[in-house]
Amino acid sequence: MALAARLLPLPLLSRPLPGPVTRLRTLGSTEVRLTLTEICCLCRRRLGSSAAPIPRYTRAWTSPALRSWSSRRSLLGRVEHPPALASLPASPSRSYSTEEQPQQRQRTRMIILGFSNPINWVRTRIYAFLIWAYFDKEFSIAEFSEGAKQAFAYVSKLLSQCKFDLLEELVAKEVLQILKEKVTSLSDNHKNALAADIDDIVYTSTGDISIYYDEKGRKFVNILMCFWYLTSANIPSESLSGANVFQVKLGDQSVETKQLLSASYEFQREFTQGVKPDWTIARIEHSKLLE
């Protein structure tokens, strides 16, 4: 069940996910501490409520855009000069001592430290083990989280572009209908804030996992994933009360102002024998944008 090819694997429970503390640090700028509890009221509210059974959907999750791509590194070989050029005088060159190094462009670095509730962490790992032991021997919570991150970036971009037809096989029909009404009523800036570039996702957390059976004996797994991401969308600060705003230094040039937003995506899959192993998104919530 290569998660990368089909997307993710699954769960959900209902305990509060305590607000982890995130520290953002950039070269040449002041260190900023952000408390995720203060910016993710939506996630805290959802995780603190009791888990109610969610309608089952059988939409397929097969988009090739969700496959994970391995990073590639270019290899630079050594340049060899032809023999005819060996006799030519060497062109003047400048050497650098340890005290005089060629000036290099600074790169923005960010260090994220997140701390989850240890009880919630242990519980989700136990449920992940049960999924592996009884439902899917190829299931891995680490691979699922990575696939969920890619799915979040892909789906949020389509949402911001109002390409709802491309989401029909990824999002539950009832959920998609509600999203159409909410997203189309947003301003352009708020629509842009929905999109999360995968490089701007600073923290991912497994919020909840649930395993349950319906009255017909069908087996279902729900996994709630919480994401925190940066956006440079031009949104008035008063429209996002409680959101953290800070500056990111881009090398040695300009300074860009970004906001830290949160979103919750719930993934669902039916594990009944004979049913296709497809994942679907059963709930989408963007704190302060889609409420």
Curated annotation (Swiss-Prot):
Localization terms from the record: Mitochondrion matrix
Record's keyword terms, sorted: Mitochondrion, Transit peptide
Transit peptide: 1-96
GO-annotated cellular components: mitochondrial matrix
Main localization category: mitochondrion
Database matches in PANTHER family: M-AAA PROTEASE-INTERACTING PROTEIN 1, MITOCHONDRIAL
Quaternary structure and partners: Interacts with AFG3L2. Interacts with SPG7. Interacts with SMDT1/EMRE (via the N-terminal transit peptide); interaction is direct and takes place before maturation of SMDT1/EMRE.
The name this protein goes by in its record: m-AAA protease-interacting protein 1, mitochondrial
Organism from which the protein derives: Mus musculus
Gene that encodes it: Maip1
